Design a protein with these regions (language model features):
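Helix-turn-helix
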Residues: 40, 44, 48-81, 86
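Hydrophobic alpha-helical connector segments
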Residues: 98-140, 160, 169
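Alpha-helical structural segments
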Residues: 40-47, 82-98, 109-116, 143-147
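Hydrophobic alpha-helical segments that drive targeting, anchoring, or assembly
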Residues: 62, 140-144
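Short, hydrophobic secondary-structure boundary micro-motifs
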Residues: 129-131, 185, 209
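Hydrophobic alpha-helical bundle segments that form small-molecule/ligand-binding pockets
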Residues: 144-195, 237-244
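N-terminal intrinsically disordered/low-complexity leader segments
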Residues: 1-35, 207-216
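A structured, mid-to-C-terminal "fold-capping" secondary-structure block
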Residues: 2, 188-244
Length: 244
């Protein structure tokens, strides 16, 4: 009896799987009750990255940490980029929103948020690179976005302007954290950098740099320097937009 199925060339193509991990089901494939979850996989990856850096994270390493076969994890996390997105969202779940409840004082609220974010970046040194390079659209990242919009609502800025302000805010803190990491990892590099810039300032080729060096005091406490820089960023966020 001839088959009732149409030739393969006439069958509709299977729908393409969503690229975003957040649009995919928690687990694909049939079989017994899942032994793992995205949460446990992300937690294992975060632990590896905290101990050894982001470059040490691989599906093989995560599988070994969970006592699972590498290929079995692809039922939960189809590719490395998805794992990075899960790690980012797992880390930003650590915000203490009870301590960050908006008070109506935007400057104070943003300062508290900035200090929590810097603490998060210090606990997870790999996090700044992901915040800058990956879209923060997981459920925990969206909660952070919603909180930032709530904190900045009293400014009267539109939603688009406040989203731009959030990008500025996050970018500053992540880059500050990365600079801290570089300085801590290479004391010799830091000493050479200061000496190099001092010689450049004294060369006569950079008069404004020379003036800045002449009128600047010693670096001082890193946390105090962060407070000053964060306050400038917050001032920029709260400033009325320039008429165009």
């Amino acid at each position: 009896m001839p088959s009732s199925k149409p030739p393969s060339s006439q069958r509709p193509a299977a729908p393409e799987a969503p690229e975003l991990i957040w649009l995919r089901p928690e687990r694909t494939g049939r079989g017994p009750k899942p032994a793992h979850s995205r949460t446990s996989i992300a937690a294992a990856a975060v632990e590896i990255a905290d101990a050894e850096g982001l470059e040490a994270v691989s599906m093989r390493r995560v599988a070994a940490a969970l006592g699972a076969g590498t290929m079995s994890l692809y039922n939960y996390v189809p590719k490395k980029e998805h794992l990075l997105d899960l790690m980012l969202d797992a880390a930003v779940a650590e915000y203490d929103y009870a301590a960050l409840a908006p008070t109506g004082d935007c400057r104070a609220d943003l300062a508290r948020l900035g200090h929590q974010q810097l603490g998060l970046c210090r606990r997870h040194p790999w996090l700044p690179a992901l915040v800058i390079s990956r879209p923060g659209i997981g459920p925990n990242a969206l909660r952070y976005t919603d909180h930032f919009l709530a904190v900045t609502a009293p400014t009267g800025l539109g939603g688009g302007a406040r989203m731009e302000a959030m990008a500025l805010f996050n970018g500053f803190i992540c880059q500050y954290a990365q600079y801290e990491q570089s300085a801590a990892a290479g004391a010799k590099w830091q000493t050479e950098l200061v000496g190099y810039l001092a010689r450049a300032a004294m060369s006569g080729e950079y008069p404004h740099l020379a003036q800045a060096f002449a009128t600047s005091g010693p670096p001082g406490d890193p946390d105090t320097a962060f407070d000053r820089a964060l306050d400038r960023v917050i001032t920029a966020i709260l400033a009325p937009p320039t008429p165009r």
